[in-house]
Structures are given as C-alpha cells and as structure tokens.
From Swiss-Prot:
The keyword Transmembrane helix does not apply. This is Large ribosomal subunit protein bL21. Part of the 50S ribosomal subunit. Contacts protein L20. One of its GO terms (biological process) is translation. Keywords: Ribonucleoprotein, Ribosomal protein, RNA-binding, rRNA-binding.
Length: 108
C-alpha cells in the first residue's frame, strides 16, 4: 500500500517503512507525527483512491528519526566586465522521518 501526502508545500509518495526527508517539522527524534493531508491512497493490485482534494478520514503516521541539513546549494551571480561577483551558500533544514502506518478511510 502507498499514499501521497502533502506536507509543507510539497507532495511525497510514501509506503510503509519508507524513509523520507521532508521540510523541517518541529519535534524531537523518536516522537511520532501524523499527516492528515492524504491526497491519494493506492494498492499495487487494486485501483487507487484519489481525494477531492484530500481523502477524508485517511492518515499517515510517521516517526521522526533526525533533524538534518541538506547539502549546500551554491548561488553564484556575476556581471561580466563590471567586477561584480557574489557567491553564497544555503543549507536547507530538513526532517528525516520513517513511515510507520498508513490508515485508510472507511470509504476506500
């Protein structure tokens, strides 16, 4: 079974026991969180159930593993012949979570 969840401004396709990196969520490592915005639930042998826009009653439970920072992204700006160079780096804070359970709604 898999699900598509929305957290932050992104959508993620998750399955049970999968480990994903999402935008930073406050919480200690080891604590559990629940995602209520489930956009789609599906099984590999059956047709998928797509929400309008979310699946009512469905939820995904996850456990926080780590609070991390992604790899550095370099932003470099230059204007030729003007001696203008600007180099900056940015590391986005992310949360690594493990999907524990996908709960279907009664109408799925």
């Amino acid at each position: 079974m898999f699900a598509v969840i929305k957290t932050g401004s992104k959508q993620y396709r998750v399955a049970k026991d999968s480990i994903i990196k999402i935008e930073k969520i406050d919480g200690e490592p080891g604590s559990t969180i629940e995602f209520k915005e489930v956009l789609m639930i599906g099984e590999y042998s059956k047709p998928s159930f797509i929400g309008t826009p979310i699946v009512k009653g469905a939820s995904v439970t996850a456990q926080i593993l780590n609070q991390l920072r992604n790899q550095k992204v370099i932003v470099f700006k230059k204007k030729r012949r003007k001696n203008y160079r600007n180099k900056r780096g940015h590391k986005q804070e992310v949360t690594q979570v493990k999907i524990i359970d996908i709960a279907k709604a009664s109408n799925c």
